[in-house]
């Protein structure tokens, strides 16, 4: 059903074979046995045979974020790559990698899974990585994918240097995507840019049983700020004007700065009765200087026929008390 809809809507599909990292709580993903290898080749053959006639399918995935542990996996990856080419010479092969080594030179296309600046360093370090890739490996047909967790129910009052396993505010995810877009958008080095997940999804390995890297919540009801960033950048059919951090309607500091995503030109920002100047930070991203506000204030952004607004309560705000998160134990976990 999904591929049929992609055929109708003109969405491009990358179909993956199930060779990923390692099994849950396992150390290796590849076992050098004839049975293991033949099973993987058969699965790839069946995937190609079942989806060959879908015009939306444009590439065959060979592996994803494979760990280089145990036996050398590169001969097996070459067999998988040759199998895909033998069955379908019209489509390229692709892989997603976050490792160094020979496995990155096997498929026709390679997509780099990147997260510099999420747990270590600065998000600006992705520009350093990009420049090194341009200098040393520009012969590779490279794409890039990235993402970070953010929960709309988690609010941050101060900048955090690193995410915590049980406290991942949406604001940090938003800033991560903003900086990556600024550094990588429309870079000719990359043939494509991929976001890790469109939707949050259930994961037994994550706090709360949810992987929060999506742009939309697990129940599909709430769109995160990062969603509107990419809608402004990538959706030419639907105009976007969005004030960032609207869910943080209670703020304890009197000096506030605002960000707006706009695909319809520079917005005009009204804070109460005042007009606040905005400057373009990056493509479709606009930021204001900090302004002094107090009490209940309406903030409104206007650009052409588009308008977005939010009402804030500023000053003397009690910070929400964090609820203790119980330690995870063995056994099935609730995801919603």
Region locations from a protein language model:
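Substrate-binding clefts and catalytic carboxylate motifs of secreted carbohydrate-active enzymes
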Residues: 41, 56-60, 81-85, 94, ...
